[in-house]
């Protein structure tokens, strides 16, 4: 049997981390078994579904490189198929037309709730022989079995049982002729030959209804696995108040897709004590029986740690392709300065996100208007004039410009003036970067370049001279 899974989001908003984890688990399960992964857009909610949301879902899936083998399928393009199946069910007696008014249904609901009963349709039209005009408004309901129970072996939670007496005859076609969500899902899973349905635990109550419809259609019943919810670090359901929840927001905040995938796969699944997983290792080791049935707590600090790891562990050339987007957001012209891959090597240890890296690299490519106020006050004092003049001249004398030669020039200046490296290094750092912090000074000056470094040292000397004149 060929394994076939699906990810079926509703395009009413962005792709959130809970949906992304479900997609990842479905994708991994299919890949682990050499199967296929289907993308299906469940857009039957015509009022809330938007093209922008569909695009956001696609963007998130593509950014995470969760490629699909079939689709995307759109439920709104399959209405003829759904209605054909409903008409067949009406002929076979597994569905029936219901003419009950909204007023009657509301009164029934209030009466049941007053008695402490679970609100449900009472089946009035199920056995009715009243004649109705062809154009009289009605819905179509599924004739749910009235005896026995539905039992399914959830691959994460174990056996789950529902009594059919708890399930009412759900509506499968509305008065406007449109099929409902629970019915469309069933026909889609049947037609697309889905073998394993991996989805959130909020769908558990839909499962017995969907199984009963599948059995009525004499269709195969897939295997179900319901993943627990994701909570914030306060134990409450993850929401916007906990920070970013959109996959693309994490991209915007400077996270690598490898970091988010690694974090999400471990958010409810484990393989021994291993924390870092390549995509290939995820595929190799992933099993549903290792997925926890308990809710998981989202920990941003852990994700940040993983992101920092991947910034330094992945090839700099690859990280640079993701950094490029953030550089563009900052409007930095990188034509005059180090290659982005070299920048990743320079700033990788200091920066935990690519956004932070982009926001802290401008001085490598563009001249700054002024020195940081605290740094210039502390380090661009008259006492720094001589060290800057000497190191400038030594840098100017270098004919070959590797970082080690820059280091020798700085060290030689300190030796000549008989001062500590800090007396030379700190004024030089402020002079060439405009700030009091940077990566190692020799590689920083090397990356900025000889001409630009000397120009900036001269600018710092002019600043010191002005400061001396004002005293």
From Swiss-Prot:
* Gene this protein is translated from: gltX
Kindly provide the name given to this protein in its UniProt entry.
Glutamate--tRNA ligase
**What domain of life does the UniProt record list for this protein's source?**
Bacteria
Q: Where is this motif: 'HIGH' region?
A: 9-19
PANTHER family the UniProt entry points to: GLUTAMATE--TRNA LIGASE, GLUTAMATE--TRNA LIGASE, MITOCHONDRIAL-RELATED
Q: Which residues bind ATP?
A: 240
Cofactor(s) annotated in UniProt? Zn(2+)
Localization (cell): Cytoplasm
User: By its UniProt entry, which NCBIfam families does this protein fall under?
Assistant: gltX_bact
The cross-references to Pfam families, in alphabetical order and at most eight, read:
Anticodon_2 (PF19269), tRNA-synt_1c (PF00749)
Keywords of the record, alphabetical order, are: Aminoacyl-tRNA synthetase, ATP-binding, Cytoplasm, Ligase, Metal-binding, Nucleotide-binding, Protein biosynthesis, Zinc
Query: An example Gene Ontology cellular component term from the record?
Result: cytosol
According to the record, cofactor stoichiometry and binding are noted as: Binds 1 zinc ion per subunit.
Among PROSITE patterns, the record links this protein to: AA_TRNA_LIGASE_I
Renumbered ranges of motif 'KMSKS' region: 237-241
Q: What is its EC number?
A: 6.1.1.17
Assembly description? Monomer.
Main function:
Catalyzes the attachment of glutamate to tRNA(Glu) in a two-step reaction: glutamate is first activated by ATP to form Glu-AMP and then transferred to the acceptor end of tRNA(Glu).
Can the keyword Lipid metabolism be found in this entry's annotation?
Answer: no
Q: Please give the family membership noted in the entry.
A: Belongs to the class-I aminoacyl-tRNA synthetase family. Glutamate--tRNA ligase type 1 subfamily.
GO biological process terms on file: glutamyl-tRNA aminoacylation
């Amino acid at each position: 049997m060929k394994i076939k899974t699906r990810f079926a989001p509703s395009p009413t908003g962005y792709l959130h981390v809970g949906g992304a984890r479900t997609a990842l688990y479905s994708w991994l399960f299919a890949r682990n078994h050499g199967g296929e992964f289907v993308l299906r857009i469940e857009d039957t909610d015509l009022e809330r579904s938007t093209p922008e949301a569909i695009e956001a879902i696609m963007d998130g899936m593509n950014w995470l490189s969760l490629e699909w083998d079939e689709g995307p399928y759109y439920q709104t393009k399959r209405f003829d198929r759904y209605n054909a199946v409903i008409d067949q069910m009406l002929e076979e007696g597994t569905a029936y037309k219901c003419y009950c008014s909204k007023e009657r249904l509301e009164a029934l609901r209030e009466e049941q709730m007053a008695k402490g009963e679970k609100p449900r349709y009472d089946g009035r039209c199920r056995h009715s022989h009243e004649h109705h005009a062809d154009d009289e408004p009605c819905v179509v309901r599924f004739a749910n079995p009235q005896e026995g129970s539905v039992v399914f072996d959830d691959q994460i939670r174990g056996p789950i049982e529902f009594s059919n007496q708890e399930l009412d005859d759900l509506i499968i076609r509305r008065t406007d002729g449109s099929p409902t969500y629970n019915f469309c899902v069933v026909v889609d899973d049947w037609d697309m030959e889905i073998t394993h349905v991996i989805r959130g635990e909020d769908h558990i109550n839909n499962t017995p209804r969907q199984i009963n419809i599948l059995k009525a259609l004499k269709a195969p019943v897939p295997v179900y696995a319901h993943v627990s919810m994701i909570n914030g670090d306060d134990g409450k359901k993850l929401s916007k108040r906990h920070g970013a929840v959109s996959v693309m927001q994490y991209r915007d905040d400077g996270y690598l897709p490898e970091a988010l995938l690694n974090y999400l796969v471990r958010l409810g699944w484990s393989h021994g004590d291993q924390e870092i997983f390549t995509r290939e290792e995820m595929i190799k080791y992933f099993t549903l029986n290792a997925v926890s049935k308990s809710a998981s707590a989202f920990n941003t600090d852990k994700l940040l740690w993983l992101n920092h790891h991947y910034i330094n562990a992945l090839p700099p050339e690859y990280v640079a392709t993701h950094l490029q987007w953030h550089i563009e957001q900052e409007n930095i012209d990188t034509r005059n300065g180090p290659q982005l891959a070299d920048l990743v090597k320079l700033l990788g240890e200091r920066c935990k996100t690519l956004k932070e890296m982009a926001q802290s690299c401008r001085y490598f490519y563009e001249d700054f208007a002024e020195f940081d106020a605290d740094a210039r006050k502390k380090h661009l004092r008259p006492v720094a004039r001589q060290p800057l003049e000497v190191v400038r001249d030594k840098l100017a004398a270098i004919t070959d410009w590797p970082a080690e030669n820059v280091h020798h020039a700085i060290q030689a200046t300190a030796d000549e003036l008989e001062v500590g490296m800090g007396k030379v290094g700190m004024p030089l750092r402020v002079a060439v970067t405009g700030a009091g912090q940077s990566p190692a000074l020799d590689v920083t000056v090397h990356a900025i370049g000889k001409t630009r470094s000397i120009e900036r040292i001269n600018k710092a000397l002019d600043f010191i001279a002005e400061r001396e004149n004002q005293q």
